[in-house]
Amino acid sequence: MLDKVKEIIVEQLGVDADQIKPESNFVDDLGADSLDTVELIMSFEEEFGVEIPDTEAEKIKTVQDVINYIEANKK
């Protein structure tokens, strides 16, 4: 799953895949702004078939946070 998440991040943010680690923070480490994070969440929802409510999306700060949420809520 990490590889697919990385692929989406590379596509959305234009960062090098080598920069993306599980502990990478979207804003601090990968340079995402608030619009980028919204677009990332929408891409993760579409790719993995999960719904991430705004209240949960606000808690997702790192790559590992996304993976944990998807694994816990995948249908």
UniProtKB/Swiss-Prot annotation:
It holds the Pfam family PP-binding. It is found in: Cytoplasm. The keyword Cytoplasm applies. The modification O-(pantetheine 4'-phosphoryl)serine is found at residue 34. 4'-phosphopantetheine is transferred from CoA to a specific serine of apo-ACP by AcpS. This modification is essential for activity because fatty acids are bound in thioester linkage to the sulfhydryl of the prosthetic group. Its main location: cytoplasm. GO terms for molecular function: acyl binding; acyl carrier activity; phosphopantetheine binding. Residues 1-74 form the Carrier domain. GO terms for biological process: lipid A biosynthetic process. SUPFAM superfamilies: ACP-like. Keywords: Cytoplasm, Fatty acid biosynthesis, Fatty acid metabolism, Lipid biosynthesis, Lipid metabolism, Phosphopantetheine, Phosphoprotein. GO terms for cellular component: cytosol; membrane. Belongs to the acyl carrier protein (ACP) family. This is Acyl carrier protein.
